[in-house]
């Protein structure tokens, strides 16, 4: 009889545990989904900020070209557009600013506006590494950067990443100066101010892993 009671208790405990796990499985799945969604949201926000910075810098370059070709009105339009992109209050610039170990302006915020990934200069080709690079390229084409990097790491391929950093405060000030100078029809000086915005970009190179 005791054995029967004990067996009944164990069965009841196991049954309740199964129900508890079943009840909590959707919660765990929901939490995981929320984490994935938050990660995707953060990545999308960072990408949007980088795009705004990159578009602003392209506007600066084309504005200088417009001045060179004698089209100050176009230069003014592009400069205003670049300034608007960097003054967007809805963008959380500080949240995605890169803490700079190599930056030369301590009171500024550096924004990653572009990046490139390449093979280390010390790379020596082997059939295995060539195959890994091919697979990595396929994964990169599908947007799987993490998988591509892991493929190269496992194959012992050294990878370097170059990040192009824009000093936000300095660039905003340079654009404000350029706008004032364009309004005064001081086009040579405006071009120099725009050049100053371009020259503020720095490149931060980092070895993701070495071979």
From Swiss-Prot:
Signal peptide as annotated in the record: 1-21
Annotated protein name in UniProt: Protein YfdX
Gene3D superfamilies in the record: 6.10.250.2140, YfdX protein domain
One Pfam family hit: YfdX
Cross-referenced InterPro entries: Uncharacterised_YfdX
Keywords: Signal
Induction: By EvgA.
Keyword Cell membrane recorded: no
